[in-house]
Amino acid sequence: MKARPALNTTGGKGGVKGDFHIHTYYSDGVFSPEKIVDLSLEAGLQVIALTDHDNVLSYDVATEYLKTKNVDFTVIRGIEVNTLYKDYEVHILGYFPDVTKSDFKNLLKIQQHARIKQTKEILHLLAKKEGIKIAFDDVKNMVAEGGSIGRPHIAKAITNAGGTSSVMEAYSKYIHRASPVYVERKTVTPFDAVEVIYDSGGIPVIAHPYDIDIAEKL
Protein backbone atom coordinates (compact mmCIF):
# COMPACT_ATOMS: atom_id res chain seq x y z
CA MET A 1 0.00 0.00 0.00
CA LYS A 2 1.37 3.41 -0.89
CA ALA A 3 2.39 5.49 2.10
CA ARG A 4 0.27 8.62 2.33
CA PRO A 5 -1.24 10.59 5.20
CA ALA A 6 -4.51 9.14 6.46
CA LEU A 7 -7.49 11.41 5.97
CA ASN A 8 -9.53 12.62 8.92
CA THR A 9 -12.90 13.04 7.25
CA THR A 10 -14.51 15.24 9.90
CA GLY A 11 -11.54 17.45 10.72
CA GLY A 12 -11.62 16.82 14.46
CA LYS A 13 -9.95 14.42 16.82
CA GLY A 14 -12.97 12.16 16.66
CA GLY A 15 -12.99 11.97 12.88
CA VAL A 16 -12.85 8.84 10.78
CA LYS A 17 -9.41 7.96 9.45
CA GLY A 18 -9.39 6.61 5.93
CA ASP A 19 -7.55 6.26 2.64
CA PHE A 20 -9.74 6.72 -0.42
CA HIS A 21 -7.31 5.98 -3.25
CA ILE A 22 -5.74 2.53 -2.99
CA HIS A 23 -4.60 0.13 -5.69
CA THR A 24 -4.13 -3.62 -5.35
CA TYR A 25 -2.42 -6.21 -7.48
CA TYR A 26 -5.52 -6.19 -9.66
CA SER A 27 -3.92 -3.16 -11.35
CA ASP A 28 -0.60 -1.47 -10.57
CA GLY A 29 -0.55 -2.10 -6.83
CA VAL A 30 1.73 -4.58 -5.09
CA PHE A 31 -0.48 -6.17 -2.46
CA SER A 32 -3.57 -8.37 -2.52
CA PRO A 33 -6.88 -6.94 -1.27
CA GLU A 34 -6.55 -9.07 1.86
CA LYS A 35 -3.10 -7.64 2.58
CA ILE A 36 -4.42 -4.13 2.02
CA VAL A 37 -7.11 -4.73 4.65
CA ASP A 38 -4.52 -6.02 7.13
CA LEU A 39 -2.16 -3.10 6.51
CA SER A 40 -5.01 -0.62 6.83
CA LEU A 41 -6.06 -2.09 10.17
CA GLU A 42 -2.47 -1.98 11.39
CA ALA A 43 -2.31 1.69 10.38
CA GLY A 44 -5.41 2.46 12.42
CA LEU A 45 -7.63 3.24 9.46
CA GLN A 46 -11.38 2.78 9.72
CA VAL A 47 -12.38 3.05 6.07
CA ILE A 48 -10.66 2.54 2.72
CA ALA A 49 -11.69 2.79 -0.91
CA LEU A 50 -10.23 0.30 -3.37
CA THR A 51 -9.78 2.17 -6.64
CA ASP A 52 -7.91 -0.05 -9.06
CA HIS A 53 -7.39 1.15 -12.60
CA ASP A 54 -10.31 0.19 -14.86
CA ASN A 55 -11.64 -2.72 -12.79
CA VAL A 56 -13.52 -3.37 -9.54
CA LEU A 57 -12.42 -6.93 -8.80
CA SER A 58 -10.64 -6.21 -5.52
CA TYR A 59 -13.77 -5.09 -3.66
CA ASP A 60 -15.47 -8.48 -3.44
CA VAL A 61 -12.21 -10.15 -2.41
CA ALA A 62 -11.63 -7.60 0.34
CA THR A 63 -15.18 -7.70 1.69
CA GLU A 64 -15.18 -11.50 1.79
CA TYR A 65 -11.93 -11.43 3.72
CA LEU A 66 -13.32 -8.79 6.06
CA LYS A 67 -16.06 -11.21 7.10
CA THR A 68 -13.37 -13.25 8.85
CA LYS A 69 -12.41 -10.25 10.98
CA ASN A 70 -14.29 -9.04 14.03
CA VAL A 71 -13.58 -5.36 13.41
CA ASP A 72 -15.43 -2.13 12.71
CA PHE A 73 -13.98 -1.40 9.29
CA THR A 74 -15.47 -0.28 5.97
CA VAL A 75 -14.35 -1.01 2.43
CA ILE A 76 -15.76 1.25 -0.29
CA ARG A 77 -16.09 0.00 -3.85
CA GLY A 78 -14.24 2.33 -6.17
CA ILE A 79 -12.45 2.58 -9.49
CA GLU A 80 -9.94 4.81 -11.24
CA VAL A 81 -10.82 5.20 -14.90
CA ASN A 82 -7.97 6.18 -17.20
CA THR A 83 -9.23 8.67 -19.78
CA LEU A 84 -7.87 10.95 -22.49
CA TYR A 85 -8.75 14.59 -23.16
CA LYS A 86 -6.87 16.73 -25.70
CA ASP A 87 -3.74 14.56 -25.41
CA TYR A 88 -3.83 14.76 -21.61
CA GLU A 89 -4.30 11.66 -19.52
CA VAL A 90 -6.98 12.32 -16.92
CA HIS A 91 -7.84 9.81 -14.23
CA ILE A 92 -11.39 9.80 -12.89
CA LEU A 93 -12.12 8.17 -9.55
CA GLY A 94 -15.56 6.69 -9.06
CA TYR A 95 -17.01 5.78 -5.67
CA PHE A 96 -20.04 3.57 -4.90
CA PRO A 97 -20.88 2.61 -8.52
CA ASP A 98 -23.56 0.02 -9.19
CA VAL A 99 -21.43 -2.43 -11.12
CA THR A 100 -24.48 -4.32 -12.41
CA LYS A 101 -25.46 -1.43 -14.69
CA SER A 102 -24.95 -2.30 -18.35
CA ASP A 103 -23.21 0.97 -19.21
CA PHE A 104 -20.75 0.45 -16.38
CA LYS A 105 -20.03 -3.10 -17.50
CA ASN A 106 -19.52 -1.83 -21.04
CA LEU A 107 -17.10 0.84 -19.81
CA LEU A 108 -14.98 -1.83 -18.15
CA LYS A 109 -14.96 -3.90 -21.35
CA ILE A 110 -13.86 -0.88 -23.40
CA GLN A 111 -11.08 -0.07 -20.96
CA GLN A 112 -9.79 -3.62 -20.74
CA HIS A 113 -9.83 -4.00 -24.52
CA ALA A 114 -7.85 -0.76 -24.87
CA ARG A 115 -5.25 -1.96 -22.38
CA ILE A 116 -4.80 -5.31 -24.10
CA LYS A 117 -4.59 -3.70 -27.56
CA GLN A 118 -2.02 -1.14 -26.41
CA THR A 119 0.12 -3.79 -24.74
CA LYS A 120 0.14 -6.09 -27.76
CA GLU A 121 1.02 -3.23 -30.11
CA ILE A 122 3.90 -2.07 -27.91
CA LEU A 123 5.23 -5.62 -27.60
CA HIS A 124 5.08 -5.98 -31.39
CA LEU A 125 7.10 -2.78 -31.88
CA LEU A 126 9.60 -3.75 -29.18
CA ALA A 127 10.31 -6.99 -31.04
CA LYS A 128 10.35 -5.38 -34.48
CA LYS A 129 12.39 -2.24 -33.74
CA GLU A 130 14.42 -3.11 -30.65
CA GLY A 131 14.74 -6.88 -30.83
CA ILE A 132 13.19 -7.23 -27.38
CA LYS A 133 10.87 -10.22 -27.55
CA ILE A 134 8.22 -10.47 -24.85
CA ALA A 135 5.22 -12.78 -24.86
CA PHE A 136 1.88 -11.17 -24.04
CA ASP A 137 1.29 -13.74 -21.30
CA ASP A 138 4.51 -12.62 -19.60
CA VAL A 139 2.87 -9.23 -19.09
CA LYS A 140 -0.60 -10.57 -18.35
CA ASN A 141 0.72 -12.85 -15.61
CA MET A 142 2.04 -9.88 -13.64
CA VAL A 143 -1.44 -8.96 -12.45
CA ALA A 144 -4.06 -10.97 -10.63
CA GLU A 145 -6.46 -12.88 -12.88
CA GLY A 146 -8.76 -10.48 -14.70
CA GLY A 147 -6.77 -7.45 -13.56
CA SER A 148 -5.69 -4.41 -15.57
CA ILE A 149 -2.37 -4.65 -17.38
CA GLY A 150 -0.58 -1.41 -18.12
CA ARG A 151 2.67 0.47 -18.52
CA PRO A 152 4.24 -0.60 -15.19
CA HIS A 153 3.87 -4.22 -16.21
CA ILE A 154 5.28 -3.61 -19.68
CA ALA A 155 8.27 -1.80 -18.17
CA LYS A 156 8.89 -4.65 -15.77
CA ALA A 157 8.60 -7.20 -18.59
CA ILE A 158 11.17 -5.28 -20.63
CA THR A 159 13.57 -5.40 -17.69
CA ASN A 160 12.89 -9.08 -17.07
CA ALA A 161 13.65 -9.79 -20.73
CA GLY A 162 17.03 -8.07 -20.43
CA GLY A 163 16.01 -5.06 -22.50
CA THR A 164 17.03 -2.67 -19.72
CA SER A 165 18.82 -2.90 -16.41
CA SER A 166 15.95 -1.40 -14.42
CA VAL A 167 12.26 -0.58 -14.62
CA MET A 168 13.05 3.14 -14.47
CA GLU A 169 15.34 2.74 -17.48
CA ALA A 170 12.54 0.93 -19.32
CA TYR A 171 10.27 3.90 -18.67
CA SER A 172 12.85 6.45 -19.79
CA LYS A 173 13.71 4.55 -22.98
CA TYR A 174 10.42 3.05 -24.09
CA ILE A 175 7.34 3.96 -22.03
CA HIS A 176 6.70 7.53 -23.14
CA ARG A 177 5.20 9.30 -26.12
CA ALA A 178 8.51 10.19 -27.76
CA SER A 179 9.57 6.54 -27.90
CA PRO A 180 9.39 4.87 -31.34
CA VAL A 181 7.79 1.81 -29.76
CA TYR A 182 5.19 3.57 -27.64
CA VAL A 183 1.52 3.38 -28.59
CA GLU A 184 -1.09 5.62 -26.98
CA ARG A 185 -3.97 3.82 -25.34
CA LYS A 186 -7.25 4.59 -27.11
CA THR A 187 -9.61 5.12 -24.23
CA VAL A 188 -12.74 7.02 -23.24
CA THR A 189 -12.94 10.73 -22.42
CA PRO A 190 -13.27 12.00 -18.85
CA PHE A 191 -16.78 13.14 -19.73
CA ASP A 192 -17.72 9.61 -20.78
CA ALA A 193 -16.36 8.23 -17.51
CA VAL A 194 -18.13 10.81 -15.38
CA GLU A 195 -21.45 10.19 -17.14
CA VAL A 196 -21.22 6.42 -16.69
CA ILE A 197 -20.24 6.75 -13.03
CA TYR A 198 -23.12 9.16 -12.37
CA ASP A 199 -25.58 6.96 -14.23
CA SER A 200 -24.49 3.98 -12.14
CA GLY A 201 -25.24 5.89 -8.95
CA GLY A 202 -21.59 6.61 -8.23
CA ILE A 203 -19.64 9.72 -7.28
CA PRO A 204 -16.95 10.86 -9.77
CA VAL A 205 -13.85 12.77 -8.66
CA ILE A 206 -10.76 13.88 -10.60
CA ALA A 207 -7.73 12.00 -9.30
CA HIS A 208 -4.57 13.98 -8.36
CA PRO A 209 -5.90 17.21 -9.96
CA TYR A 210 -2.77 19.20 -9.13
CA ASP A 211 -0.83 17.01 -11.55
CA ILE A 212 -3.13 17.92 -14.45
CA ASP A 213 -2.53 21.24 -16.20
CA ILE A 214 -6.07 21.39 -17.57
CA ALA A 215 -7.92 20.28 -14.43
CA GLU A 216 -9.67 23.64 -14.01
CA LYS A 217 -10.97 23.48 -17.59
CA LEU A 218 -12.65 20.12 -17.18
Outline where the language-model segments fall:
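Amphipathic alpha-helical segments that form well-ordered structural scaffolds
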Residues: 121-125, 157, 192, 196
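Mid-domain alpha/beta scaffold segments of enzyme catalytic cores
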Residues: 35, 46, 53-117, 121, ...
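Short aromatic/hydrophobic-glycine micro-motifs
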Residues: 45, 131-132, 163, 202
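An N-terminally biased module of ancient metal coordination in phosphate/nucleic-acid-related enzymes
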Residues: 1-88, 173-180, 188-218
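Short, flexible segments with low predicted structural confidence
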Residues: 12, 98, 167-169
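Hydrophobic, aromatic-enriched interface-forming segments
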Residues: 132-185
